[in-house]
A protein has these predicted regions:
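Terminal leader/tail segments of proteins
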Residues: 1-133
Length: 133
């Protein structure tokens, strides 16, 4: 079954190992084989990463889109998730869910679950900031 992907004008996406950018008009694509697909809104650039959960998301993104270096990215992911759960045990259930998806090679779903991890981190950081003020 093909994946239907709609790109807005100027929107980028990763399809397989290629970064594509749409032209002036909305376009509908059908991806007919099993390759990583990420929309621009789901892509995190290394220079934009600043928090532990963002680093975990980036490691997962690389696990998904860079299969040639997957063992290295998985090791980075392991180290980052260990550090996070030691520092903040409240993240353990979300991290365990993500790692279970990774173990099942469900990398896209793990990436989506990592969005929840990032949201939880943002909420905690917001609460800390509000408490200080």
């Amino acid at each position: 079954m093909a994946l239907r992907l709609t790109l807005k004008p100027g929107e980028r996406a990763i399809i397989g190992e290629a970064v594509v950018r749409n032209g002036r008009n909305r376009v509908h694509l059908l991806v007919e084989n099993e390759v990583p697909v990420l929309r621009e809104s789901d892509i995190v650039l290394p220079k934009a990463v600043g928090t532990p959960c963002e680093r975990i998301y980036l490691a997962l993104q690389l696990v998904y889109v860079d299969p040639g270096k997957r063992p290295e990215h998985l090791e980075t992911l392991r180290v980052l998730t260990d550090e996070l759960t030691q520092a903040a045990p409240s993240f353990r259930p979300l991290v365990d869910q993500i790692l279970a998806l990774v173990a099942g090679k469900r990398f896209y779903q793990a990436l989506k679950s990592a969005q929840t991890l990032r949201e939880h981190e943002r909420e905690l950081l917001t609460r800390c900031t509000e408490t200080r003020n």
